[in-house]
Amino acid sequence: MAAKKVVKQIKLQVEAGKANPAPPVGPALGQAGLNIMEFCKQFNERSKNQMGLKLPVVITVYSDRSFTFVTKSPPAALLVMKALGLQGGSATPHTVKVGTIKRAQLEEIAKTKMEDLNANDMDAAVKIIAGTCRSMGVNVE
């Protein structure tokens, strides 16, 4: 059997367990001619253990209108805000600091993100997350 032809890839960020046909999911999938409710059911089932987090999802659309999707780990900035209990980062990160994060918290976030990061080892992953923290106005200890 020949491999299916990939027509399109759609990248979205959807809250775990709360995918529904409303924007942004509905219009993006509708344009590709996909069954929106089928995606919503599968995504909600797969992501129900990560409720409350926005998950990046990459949907691969095939020529026969079937699809597959891969959920990634939540954005690093979201995990940092959750760890520190923040609503958002600093508008001026180099002058106004909004919090301080410890090395242990960075390592925990890096473990969660490791499969999606372009890092060879844990130390490199921690440095990537630390850079995200600095750009948000969070001090790194």
Swiss-Prot record:
> How is this chain modified after translation?
One or more lysine residues are methylated.
Database matches in SMART domains: RL11 (SM00649)
Report the Gene3D superfamilies cross-referenced here: Ribosomal protein L11, C-terminal domain, Ribosomal protein L11/L12, N-terminal domain
**Keyword rRNA-binding on entry:** yes
Q: Mind listing the GO molecular function terms for this protein?
A: large ribosomal subunit rRNA binding; structural constituent of ribosome
The superkingdom listed in its UniProt entry is Bacteria
Q: Name one Pfam family in it.
A: Ribosomal_L11_N
Q: Which PROSITE patterns match?
A: RIBOSOMAL_L11 (PS00359)
Q: Does the keyword Transmembrane apply?
A: no
The entry's keywords: Methylation, Ribonucleoprotein, Ribosomal protein, RNA-binding, rRNA-binding
GO cellular component term of the entry, any: cytosolic large ribosomal subunit
Enumerate the InterPro entries for this protein: Ribosomal_uL11, Ribosomal_uL11_bac-typ, Ribosomal_uL11_C, Ribosomal_uL11_C_sf, Ribosomal_uL11_CS, Ribosomal_uL11_N, Ribosomal_uL11_N_sf
Biological process, per Gene Ontology? translation
> Which family does the UniProt entry place this protein in?
Belongs to the universal ribosomal protein uL11 family.
Q: What assembly does the database describe for this protein?
A: Part of the ribosomal stalk of the 50S ribosomal subunit. Interacts with L10 and the large rRNA to form the base of the stalk. L10 forms an elongated spine to which L12 dimers bind in a sequential fashion forming a multimeric L10(L12)X complex.
Fetch the HAMAP family from UniProt: Ribosomal_uL11
- Give the function comment from the record: Forms part of the ribosomal stalk which helps the ribosome interact with GTP-bound translation factors.
Put simply, this protein is called: Large ribosomal subunit protein uL11
- Species this protein is from: Leptospira biflexa serovar Patoc (strain Patoc 1 / ATCC 23582 / Paris)
Lineage of the organism: Bacteria, Pseudomonadati, Spirochaetota, Spirochaetia, Leptospirales
Chain's gene name: rplK
